[in-house]
Amino acid sequence: VDNKLNNLILVLNCGSSSIKFAILDPKNEKKYLSGIVECLFLSETYIKWCCLEKKYYKKIGSNMNHEDALNFIIDEVLLKQKNIFNNIIGIGHRVVHGGNEIKKSSLINDYVITCIKKYICFAPLHNPANLIGIQTVIKKYPILSDKNVAVFDTSFYQNMPESSFLYAIPYNFYKKYQIRRYGAHGISHKYVSYKISVILNKKFDSLNLITCHLGNGCSIAAICNGVCVDTSMGLTPLEGLVMGTRSGDIDPAIIFFMYKQLNMSIDEIEMILNKKSGLLGLSGVSSDFRYFEKQYHLTEKAKRSVQVFCHRLSKYIASYMSLMENRLDAVIFTGGIGENVSLIRELVFSKLFLLGFKINSKLNCSTVGGKSGLITESSSHPVFVIATDEELAIAKETIKIINKK
């Protein structure tokens, strides 16, 4: 380990069935340790981590919950790396929903915790996990209890105009219950937007961008003069694009039909739209894009699923062009699918030729596996692939907030 280890940040991202963790230096952008616990609540929970170029893998039990897994991470992984662990000066937590109240990254106090609890109803899979992460770490590591920062996925969208965030339902639902578009993946959309400002050598607040975060969850954002003006996810992360297991946009009356005609319960319907739909629902086989890439030319169900996915995405890109005020600086693809699946980019932009997009096939095929770069011809609107790094983004926000104290 080099001797310049100081001012490190521990980043925690507690998902519904996984926990990602990393220790990094936000200044030199170096990751000293990173890992993931996967398959919580299932028969085999396991952990993979990487420390100083060495990789580790371990099965750690069955039916583990978030608290068990966090205790394992801290006791068995982090504390074994004393010289790294002892230089942590702050902890950054990804929190999915801050609702209408929390506009930006915040030091965690009782008020912030109350807000995270309050908005569990809008992020039932994520906010409870985020909360357990925060509470466990504060309990395990009281010396840093006032150095925990919540970085919200919703804060990037707090300046959207009413025309974007209001739903056309009685206005009272917004005034009384805060029902509106909130968006998600804000940390990733913001990170790649800042990255492109460096690549293009333009001020962030002069940029017009369309950013596409495509992973197991998928969302798209329109950014005008550095401000997000629209995004595809809504009150919850269920709206918008086709996703791994989520439906994205549907006619709301489908829900009434399932309830009344098919006698399904609300819980069943919610589970179907969140866990059994999207690519998994369309194909009946998988939500993993590696399957679709292999099978696209071989099976009808894979082709069908990918075509629905691309149809929806190209429609959103086309509609967001209308928000660009006469200039588009770049379209960005990021996330596991956005960065790695050249097929999707090819299919999506072949539909957008009329709007001035032309993919360079060679660049498109070679820009995968964490590589970033331009994938279009010089005559086209620029499309870039940019590898996202949510952990680094959270670490940078965390140190900024801690230094403000």
For each of these PLM feature ranges, what is it?
Residues 18-63:
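Short glycine-rich, Thr/Ser-proximal phosphate-binding strand/loop in the N-terminal lobe
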Residues 75-89, 140-141, 196-203, 317-329:
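Phosphate/pyrophosphate-binding loops at sites that engage ATP/ADP/AMP, CoA/4′-phosphopantetheine
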Residues 158-259:
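Glycine-rich phosphate-binding loop of actin/hexokinase-like ATP-binding domains
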Residues 370-405:
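Structural signal for terminal/edge beta-strands and the immediately following C-terminal loop/tail
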